[in-house]
Amino acid sequence: AYAFGLLMKHWAPNFLKQNPAILGSAEVSSIAVLLVVVLVVLLVSVAVGLMFALTSMRLKGTYFAMLTLALSTALYIIIKSTDLHEWTGADEGLHGIPLPLWLNPTQNRLTVYFITLGFLCVSYLLLRRFVNSPTGRIIVANRENEDRMRMIGYNPVTYRAIAFVVASVFAGFAGMFFSIWNMSATPTMISAVTTVNALIMTIMGGMGTLIGPIFGAAISQTIQQFFYTWFGARWPLIFGVLFILIVMFLPYGIVGTWRLQKGNIREGWKRLLKLFATKTEADAGQKPPSV
């Protein structure tokens, strides 16, 4: 989000001002500049993912989570620093990010929505393809049992780094679209609150699944809106109680629990239908009473 905001606010306007029609027309030039910015966002996301992977490659479990949270908090503090106020806006952030007319949410909100929706669908298909690839299957197996993967000749650290970079790239693009929608980039985007919200959505939907976090995000945001309307300022307390209940009774999330129980549910329906069919045949086979 900040890489996109910094480039669009500080570099892109100056470049287009000095080269208004470098590719023949101002509109084509603005699209080309936007593509360059997207490419830089991709490179920055890869670099951040590698940084996190290299600094936490030897850690597991709680220590791994603590270090990644500490690194994100360090970035949050750096961005809020008053020494970088001229570039990052410090506490205020970057507001009024200049965007092309067709990508401006204040004037073409529906267009931006469908572009974002298209990106979500493409991302899901790409990640589905990646998970089903040989590398993706090794990453999944590495998540389940690192020691076993090491015994059969794979380096868990390498595949964990690949997973980190892939996740960082898609998170970077998600941040870019979030900054486009709000036309701003603020420190809260990389704060611990944002991290916790993402974890809540993932846990509610189902960890270890691709469709789960999507359902979790939709359900979480919808519930939060209703709870805010019904309970006002007390909605976080009610939402917290609901989240605890979900963790207790749906420990694998909504999608994860459904997948685990799908066979039992299907078998239950078969038994129920068989019971109804048997009863219907028995009723049909009974002779009418004699008069």
Regions found by a protein language model. Name each.
Residues 1-291:
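Transmembrane alpha-helices and adjacent helix-loop boundaries
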